[in-house]
UniProtKB/Swiss-Prot annotation:
<dbReference type="Pfam" id="PF01653">
    <property type="entry name" value="DNA_ligase_aden"/>
</dbReference>
<dbReference type="InterPro" id="IPR004150">
    <property type="entry name" value="NAD_DNA_ligase_OB"/>
</dbReference>
<dbReference type="InterPro" id="IPR012340">
    <property type="entry name" value="NA-bd_OB-fold"/>
</dbReference>
<dbReference type="InterPro" id="IPR033136">
    <property type="entry name" value="DNA_ligase_CS"/>
</dbReference>
<feature type="binding site">
    <location>
        <position position="298"/>
    </location>
    <ligand>
        <name>NAD(+)</name>
    </ligand>
</feature>
<feature type="binding site">
    <location>
        <position position="433"/>
    </location>
    <ligand>
        <name>Zn(2+)</name>
    </ligand>
</feature>
<dbReference type="InterPro" id="IPR018239">
    <property type="entry name" value="DNA_ligase_AS"/>
</dbReference>
<feature type="active site" description="N6-AMP-lysine intermediate">
    <location>
        <position position="121"/>
    </location>
</feature>
<keyword id="KW-0862">Zinc</keyword>
<dbReference type="GO" id="GO:0003911">
    <property type="term" value="F:DNA ligase (NAD+) activity"/>
</dbReference>
<keyword id="KW-0436">Ligase</keyword>
<feature type="binding site">
    <location>
        <begin position="38"/>
        <end position="42"/>
    </location>
    <ligand>
        <name>NAD(+)</name>
    </ligand>
</feature>
<keyword id="KW-0460">Magnesium</keyword>
<dbReference type="InterPro" id="IPR010994">
    <property type="entry name" value="RuvA_2-like"/>
</dbReference>
<keyword id="KW-0235">DNA replication</keyword>
<dbReference type="Pfam" id="PF03120">
    <property type="entry name" value="DNA_ligase_OB"/>
</dbReference>
<feature type="binding site">
    <location>
        <position position="142"/>
    </location>
    <ligand>
        <name>NAD(+)</name>
    </ligand>
</feature>
Length: 591
């Protein structure tokens, strides 16, 4: 009886999961609506797959949770694929990758090498191109894997899809399927959304939805105006065996025919190299002009691919290794502006508190105006927070469907702490307060930096002591530190006679120091400890340094034009020269 009840619960769970997947698929692929995050979809699909494996008695052979939608959108005629166009099974951790690797290993021929072709998994829409004698004959979406929607007219409007293949030393096959991904560059996505916003039209929620909706238009002119992009990622059917290339070589072949391919692809000769490629992909994803949600790991050998074959849902020779991340949605209540040590003004979103991965998140950095414009963030927007690994959660996207009563984020024209002039750094895309030590927000951080271990190394003078001294208006500039005595610090919270005497000893000790420590300690923007050492080795004394020229700085190995400009700008400011002079006037001895 107990076992029967358990089975009923399991069956109900499986049926409910199937209904969810079907509903999400239908909305996404037919109506162009994304109801859930990628992570939620993937985790639900993974849960269903695991339950079906474990409880095979409930596996319905007429149901495939990977069929895109029961009804492919009927506004396009259908094209049957020459070879099945299956989706990839998704994995989310190294253990899953190891399991995939072990399954591949079991099917190896004697002494056969286990090479993997690793590619970035572009978050777009799969497309199947059929070329006959080098001329584009048709283009179709993945559809249900057996047949897809005819989008040939629209594909002809995508500049990166060649209408005629380029000739090389190898003649074209009579018939070949070239498969790839249609996507929209993030720069284009933001440009189009900005234009839609100006016309008070509905915005696209993400780049993939825009790409999908743009490819599946009745009017090809709309597709043309959306400036879609395409990368090829492999060959499906080909009518001649001489074109049976291993995956990595197949990419080179189609590229030689004029098919664009993603340039970060690597041939990995070990599982460790695959792991390294995955980790590298995480690091570069924020610098790409298109979205990726993982990597694709393919067995490189065509012979081994054929031996491994496919299940009813997936090829057994490839896997999608997704980036592990979690997502939570919340609301932006307002934006504060923080000023850093070097004057960088950072917008910080004040969020409706949300419990996320063990902590309550109330704030999230927006970094700079470029990021705000790129994501289209406004006050009162509902946004998604994403966290990968141990990285601090960041805002990954805006849910435009929930947008109402929003306000534009207005950047200050003068510093909110000291009213100093604000300047824009084109290279770093940041706004800067020019106040320096005059700015209360910068002063505390600059003085903390000045006494730090790499700079003057004044032991015992931490953040709490400096904060109290600033609040009581005892110190304002670095030279004021060397005017302190026990009478001025003994009454500070946490200080007594002994600790005050010890601190004064450390201050006196630090008055004899090295040139690189002073250069580093005065806090020149974009001048770190190693650059400071480089400068000290070259100039030998403080006088030579403060009287340097731009040309002189550029002649120093390792110091580029940007850093040289930062140094010259700092030394041109009379306030900064005054700070250095004041240090010399309190008998700072620089070796």
């Amino acid at each position: 009886m107990f076992k029967k009840n358990i089975n009923i619960k399991i069956k109900t769970k499986i049926l409910n999961l199937r209904k969810k997947i079907e509903m999400w698929n239908n909305n996404y692929y037919v109506k162009n609506l994304s109801l859930v995050s990628d992570e939620k979809y993937d985790s639900t699909l993974f849960e269903l797959n695991e339950l079906e494996k474990k409880y095979s008695m409930f596996l319905n052979t007429s149901y495939s949770n990977k069929i895109v939608a029961k009804n492919i959108c009927n506004k396009f005629k259908k094209i049957k694929h020459l070879s099945n166009m299956l989706s990839l099974e998704s994995i989310f951790n190294y253990k899953n990758l190891l399991n995939f690797h072990e399954k591949v290993k079991k099917n190896l021929f004697y002494n056969e090498k286990r090479y993997y072709c690793c590619e970035l998994k572009i978050d777009g829409l799969a497309i199947n191109l059929i070329y006959k004698n080098g001329i584009l004959d048709s283009a179709s979406t993945r559809g249900d894997g057996l047949q897809g929607e005819d989008v040939t007219k629209n594909a002809l409007e995508i500049k990166s899809i060649p209408h005629i293949l380029k000739k090389n030393n190898l003649s074209f096959p009579k018939k070949i399927e070239i498969r790839g991904e249609v996507f929209i560059k993030l720069s284009t996505f933001n440009k189009i959304n900005k234009m839609l916003k100006s016309k008070r039209k509905k915005l696209f929620s993400n780049a993939r939805n825009m790409a999908s909706g743009s490819l599946r238009q009745i009017n090809p002119k709309i597709t043309k105006n959306r400036s879609l992009s395409f990368y090829g990622y492999g060959i499906g059917y080909v009518n001649e065996k001489k074109y049976y290339y291993d995956q990595h070589d197949a990419l080179k072949l189609i590229n030689s025919w004029g098919i664009p391919i993603e340039k970060n692809t690597e041939l990995c000769k070990s599982l460790n190299e695959v792991k390294n490629f995955y980790e590298k992909s995480i690091k570069i994803r924020d610098y790409l002009d298109f979205n990726i949600d993982g990597i694709v790991v393919k067995v490189n050998s065509m012979k081994l691919q054929k031996k491994l074959g496919c299940s009813s849902k997936y090829p057994r020779w490839a896997i999608a290794y997704k980036f592990s991340s979690e997502e939570k949605c919340t609301k932006i209540l307002g934006v504060n502006f923080n000023v850093g040590r070097t004057g960088v003004i950072t917008p910080v979103a004040k969020l409706k508190p949300v419990y996320f991965m063990g902590t309550i998140i109330k704030y999230s950095s927006l970094h700079n105006k470029d990021i705000i414009d790129k994501l289209g963030i406004m006050i009162n927007d509902t946004v998604c927070l994403k966290k990968s690994g141990d990285v601090i959660p960041k805002i990954s996207r805006v849910i435009f469907e929930k947008r109402k009563n929003v306000k534009e984020i207005i950047f200050p024209k003068t510093c909110i702490f000291c009213k100093s002039k604000i300047e824009f750094c084109l290279r770093k895309k940041n706004l800067y307060c020019t106040g320096g030590f005059l700015c209360y927000a910068q002063r505390k951080q600059l003085l903390n930096h000045f006494v730090s271990r790499e700079a003057l190394n004044i032991k015992g003078m931490g953040n709490k002591i400096i904060s109290q001294l600033i609040e009581k208006k005892i110190i304002k500039y670095p030279s004021d530190i060397f005017k302190l005595n026990t009478d001025k610090i003994i009454f500070l919270k946490g200080m007594g006679l002994k600790s005050s005497e010890n601190l004064i000893k450390e201050i006196i000790k630090s008055k004899t120091t090295e040139l690189y420590r002073v250069i580093y300690g005065i806090g020149i923007p974009n001048v770190g400890i190693y650059t400071s050492m480089n400068l000290a080795n070259y100039y030998k004394n403080i006088s030579n340094f403060i009287n340097t020229s731009y040309e002189d700085l550029r002649s120093i190995k390792g110091i580029g034009s940007f850093t040289s400009n930062c140094i010259k700008k700092f030394l041109k400011d009379k306030r900064n020269i005054s700070i250095i002079s004041d240090l010399l006037n309190v008998n700072l001895k620089i070796k």
